[in-house]
């Protein structure tokens, strides 16, 4: 019953050696990022002449773990690592909503893709930048309500 649909799906993801030269255009790939964290700064809206405007902000995610050699897992010291992500929002509707409603300290969930690029800094030195391009943002907290 499910054999035929499963084979159809697998054919989309599997490339045979003999098809290498003819099916490169049809090959599927995946670039998805899911982040849950707190906004580190209020967003800024930037527009470079001749390019689409973009809303940019930073997002912190935390990884926590217990360390120690104790057999009782709960007795170890808690360690934490914070990772900062640069978020860019290009989609017109989402870009405007993010600029207006994303605030420093807000807890959000976002989906997007990772992008690696290069730019020239003020000293004309080539730098690499990693950016998360957001496709969807879900607001999990309202900063104004949390402050009350």
UniProtKB/Swiss-Prot annotation:
Expression (tissue specificity): Expressed in retinal ganglion cells, photoreceptors, pigmented epithelium and fibroblasts (at protein level).
Keyword Coiled coil part of the UniProt annotation: no
Presequence extent in this chain: 1-16
GO molecular function, one term: single-stranded DNA binding
Modified positions (Phosphoserine) in chain numbering: 67, 79
Residue positions, PTM N6-succinyllysine: 122
InterPro entries registered for this protein in UniProt: NA-bd_OB-fold (IPR012340), Primosome_PriB/ssb (IPR000424), ssDNA-bd (IPR011344)
Biological processes, Gene Ontology terms: DNA replication; DNA-templated DNA replication; mitochondrial genome maintenance; positive regulation of helicase activity; positive regulation of mitochondrial DNA replication; protein homotetramerization
Keyword Protein biosynthesis: no
Modified residues (N6-acetyllysine): 113
Signal peptide stretch: none
Coiled-coil ranges from the UniProt annotation: none
Pfam families, per database record: SSB
Domain SSB: 30-141
Subcellular location: Mitochondrion; Mitochondrion matrix, Mitochondrion nucleoid
Keywords, alphabetical: Acetylation, Disease variant, DNA replication, DNA-binding, Mitochondrion, Mitochondrion nucleoid, Phosphoprotein, Transit peptide
Protein task: Binds preferentially and cooperatively to pyrimidine rich single-stranded DNA (ss-DNA). In vitro, required to maintain the copy number of mitochondrial DNA (mtDNA) and plays a crucial role during mtDNA replication by stimulating the activity of the replisome components POLG and TWNK at the replication fork. Promotes the activity of the gamma complex polymerase POLG, largely by organizing the template DNA and eliminating secondary structures to favor ss-DNA conformations that facilitate POLG activity. In addition it is able to promote the 5'-3' unwinding activity of the mtDNA helicase TWNK.
Disease listed for this protein: Optic atrophy 13 with retinal and foveal abnormalities: An autosomal dominant disease characterized by visual impairment in association with bilateral optic atrophy. Atrophy of the optic disk indicates a deficiency in the number of nerve fibers which arise in the retina and converge to form the optic disk, optic nerve, optic chiasm and optic tracts. Many OPA13 patients also exhibit retinal pigmentary defects, attenuated retinal vasculature, macular dystrophy, and foveopathy.
Protein name in UniProt: Single-stranded DNA-binding protein, mitochondrial
Organism of this sequence: Homo sapiens
Source organism phylogeny: Eukaryota, Metazoa, Chordata, Craniata, Vertebrata
